[in-house]
Amino acid sequence: MTPAGKRILVMAGGTGGHVFPALAVAKYLAQQGWQVRWLGTADRMEARLVPQYGFDIDFIDIKGVRGNGLIRKLAAPFKVVRSILQAKAVIAEFKPDVVLGMGGFASGPGGVAARLAGIPLVLHEQNAIPGMTNKLLSRIATQVLCAFKNTFTTVKAKVVGNPIRQELIALGAEPKPEADEALKVLVVGGSLGAKVFNDLMPEAVAILSQQQFVTVWHQVGKDNLTGVKAAYQQHGQDGGVNIAEFIDDMEAAYRWADVVLCRAGALTVSELAAVGLPSILVPYPHAVDDHQTRNGQVLVEAGAAFLLPQAILDVNKLAGKLQLLANDRTELARMGQRARDVAVLDATEQVAAVCISLAEKG
């Protein structure tokens, strides 16, 4: 097994789609005796989340430049140089055996600093279309990994899936319970909620409930609880609906659900596959390069999900898809199995194995 005392610098931040897969790898390597340190930014979610998992984190000063104003773009090169120097200082002090970049602003300067120091750089891209940072770093990385086929077209990349929590992998292996009479719909719109779900679901459930028992667990996002609850009440549907700003225990939510209505973020798609749940995917229309549509195609092509572009989504289309699933529980179960069939369940171990191999060669 891995010799104790090896060191890895993990770079991931900004969103849960970057941070949680990186945490899965970090936890795995820490259990093997590795010393883990994190590189991130002080104003994003990693600053709060990473220390909760027991890992030390260093911060550099860097922000995105895509879509920003002229002055910020002109100043960007100077800020990038400064952030590379900050990352070099962290690397010089920590002396990692390998550096793992999994997306977010800090990965760019940190990746450049790692290669300048002669340290192996492993990249992992979670989305079907690479972000700007990983696209640039892929040219200098020692090893490029990705979750989906054909993500990178100009460099060789190994497809390993997305690292996810072991609890969800175990959940997907559990026998599925007998279906209740009521269709159980889990609605997840991210930490801020999804306005389109909050607007359409109350009326869609009212339409559906005329012919079918349905219960809903709806995560509405910050500050949306009162308004969405009132909308369900207005449509006479407050009895069978559990409304929450956040769902802290996604394992429990996935275990409860028959079908999930959600966006098509990379981590969400990978989790749906791992737990074996059918889904209705509505990609976030403003995602960079429309990468969520590409993410969702993996489940759609497997026959495990429906994909509805937000531009054409309305109450009747949403109610119709839910009715279709409610009326054919056999097909619903098949969709769940197809989702599980395309899951990559050892992504964490594969990413860790690459890091271990490069560290040992060094």
Swiss-Prot record:
Its main location: membrane. It is a peripheral membrane protein. UDP-N-acetyl-alpha-D-glucosamine binds at residues 15-17, 127, 165, 191, 247, 266-271, 292. Keywords: Cell cycle, Cell division, Cell inner membrane, Cell membrane, Cell shape, Cell wall biogenesis/degradation, Glycosyltransferase, Membrane, Peptidoglycan synthesis, Transferase. It comes from the Bacteria. Its EC number is 2.4.1.227. It catalyses: di-trans,octa-cis-undecaprenyl diphospho-N-acetyl-alpha-D-muramoyl-L-alanyl-D-glutamyl-meso-2,6-diaminopimeloyl-D-alanyl-D-alanine + UDP-N-acetyl-alpha-D-glucosamine = di-trans,octa-cis-undecaprenyl diphospho-[N-acetyl-alpha-D-glucosaminyl-(1->4)]-N-acetyl-alpha-D-muramoyl-L-alanyl-D-glutamyl-meso-2,6-diaminopimeloyl-D-alanyl-D-alanine + UDP + H(+). The keyword ATP-binding does not apply. One of its GO terms (molecular function) is UDP-N-acetyl-D-glucosamine:N-acetylmuramoyl-L-alanyl-D-glutamyl-meso-2,6-diaminopimelyl-D-alanyl-D-alanine-diphosphoundecaprenol 4-beta-N-acetylglucosaminlytransferase activity. One of its GO terms (biological process) is carbohydrate metabolic process. CDD domains: GT28_MurG. Cell wall formation. Catalyzes the transfer of a GlcNAc subunit on undecaprenyl-pyrophosphoryl-MurNAc-pentapeptide (lipid intermediate I) to form undecaprenyl-pyrophosphoryl-MurNAc-(pentapeptide)GlcNAc (lipid intermediate II). PANTHER family: GLYCOSYLTRANSFERASE, UDP-N-ACETYLGLUCOSAMINE--N-ACETYLMURAMYL-(PENTAPEPTIDE) PYROPHOSPHORYL-UNDECAPRENOL N-ACETYLGLUCOSAMINE TRANSFERASE 1. Belongs to the glycosyltransferase 28 family. MurG subfamily. This is UDP-N-acetylglucosamine--N-acetylmuramyl-(pentapeptide) pyrophosphoryl-undecaprenol N-acetylglucosamine transferase. It comes from Shewanella baltica (strain OS155 / ATCC BAA-1091). The lineage of its organism: Bacteria, Pseudomonadati, Pseudomonadota, Gammaproteobacteria, Alteromonadales.
